[in-house]
Amino acid sequence: MAVAAAVLVASVSEPSGGPPAPPVLGVSADKLLHGAAYATLAAAVALGLATPRGDGTPAGPVPPSGPTRRRVVGLAIGVAAVYGVVMEGLQGPLPYRTFDLLDAVANAVGAAIGAGAWTVGATLRDRVS
């Protein structure tokens, strides 16, 4: 929830108005920031889905492969990507923000990267324990 709240605040707040940051490896810093935010969101969603107990302790490792882990990854990507589209939609009517389809794409790509990173981390954790 905290990550989603931070993304919401960042999405609807008025930008600082400073000059845009220079591109990194040909990718605009804005798109990289979108990707990083939604990678974090998707990883948090995946972790939340794989940790069903209310006290935050895992109920048990999610199988390293199979439908359960794929379902967690798919849901994490879907939830984060849809949240990104909703955030872009909220920006449309704001006078200091705009709806940008490429931002939504960057959000979805970041979500896939974040869910993938969670998968790698969960797999490594399962192998170590």
Please give the residue ranges for each predicted region.
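Bulky hydrophobic segments
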Residues: 1-101, 112-129
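Conserved post-beta-strand hinge residue in the HATPase_c
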Residues: 104
